[in-house]
Amino acid sequence: MKPIEVKAHLNSMDGKTGRAILLGPNYLFARPITNSYVFKVGNQLCTGIMNWFVGEYYVDDKYGIVDERNENYDIYKKYIKENSNGND
C-alpha cells in the first residue's frame, strides 16, 4: 500500500481534524486487524480507524503510539526514518 495523506480527527487535538499519513493495516500476530490502520502523525507512528458511517479517519496519537515493542514498528519504521531530519 502506498502512503496516502488524509484528513483525520486527532486525539491530541481533542478530535479536531489534522494531517495524517495513512501507511497501511495494523497487524496483530502477523494478521491485519479489520478496520485498523497505522498512521504517521508528525514524526511518530500511531494507530487509528476509519469510521465508515461518516467516512472519516480517527487517529489516536496520544495512547495509540506504535513503538519498538509493537510488531507494526518493524513494518513501518522506515517512514519515520525518512524524515528524521525535521522536514516532515
What are these regions (language model features)?
Residues 18-73:
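Acidic, low-complexity, intrinsically disordered interaction modules
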Residues 1-2, 78-88:
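Short intrinsically disordered terminal tails
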Residues 3-12:
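SH3-family beta-barrel domains
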